[in-house]
Curated annotation (Swiss-Prot):
Organism (species): Synechococcus sp. (strain JA-3-3Ab) (Cyanobacteria bacterium Yellowstone A-Prime)
Domain of life: Bacteria
Cysteines joined through disulfide linkages: none
Protein name in the entry: Nucleoside triphosphate pyrophosphatase
Keywords, comma-separated and alphabetical: Cytoplasm, Hydrolase, Nucleotide metabolism
Transmembrane spans: none
Length: 197
């Protein structure tokens, strides 16, 4: 039987993905200091960060649960782009992204406290960016939306205007690849569709 699911994330987008799939869960942010983990490799970075977030929350559980940890970055032009520090950085990055193709990596960590098992995987989606004008970029940044997003854009929000197309899992760009999560849960011997019963 599928244990209760705990999402170790403050991300509203990740919550919305699980809610849309009708997967019951509760939220318990990890508050892990992400600056403790550095890597020039986006795959290694998102996997380590996702695992650290999940482990921080799993250590606090008193009942058997499945803890989901996740972290996303945009890799563009050989540079890892997380959330921008401020509006000026967001504008600079969005200008840099014009007409480019980036890769959005999301690390997925799953800890089963019942079986004491841990899985860590990642998903990658290619993102083809439009060429917004300077005025469009300034207006978008003024909404505040890009300040809370890896790579400075929210494909499920206003930022969708600036994405021409993607190759890969759409949910991954939002914050969780539900197909990957389903496979990981199956690897632990459960079915995510049990949550619908």
């Amino acid at each position: 039987m599928l244990p209760p699911i705990v999402l170790a994330s403050q991300s509203p987008a990740r919550r919305q993905l699980l809610e849309a799939a009708r997967i019951p869960f509760r939220v318990q942010p990890s508050y892990f200091d992400e600056s403790q983990i550095q890597s020039p490799d986006p795959v290694e970075l998102v996997q380590k960060l996702a695992a650290a977030k999940a482990e921080a929350v799993a250590a606090q559980q008193r009942e058997p649960v499945l803890v989901i940890g996740a972290d996303s970055v945009l890799y563009l032009g050989g540079e890892i782009l997380g959330k921008p520090a401020n509006a000026l950085e967001a504008e600079r990055r969005l200008r840099q992204m014009r007409g480019e193709v980036g890769e959005l990596y999301t690390g997925h960590a799953l800890i089963d406290t019942r079986q004491n098992r841990r899985l860590v995987h990642y998903a990658v989606t290619r993102v083809f960016f439009a060429k917004p004008s300077d005025e469009e970029i300034r207006t978008y940044v003024a909404t505040g939306e890009p300040l809370n997003c890896a790579g400075c854009f929210a494909i499920d929000g206003r930022g969708s205007l600036f994405v021409e197309r993607i190759e890969g899992c759409p949910g991954n760009v939002i914050g969780l690849s539900l197909p990957l999560l389903r496979r990981m849960i199956q690897e632990l011997g459960y079915s995510l569709t049990e949550a619908w019963n």
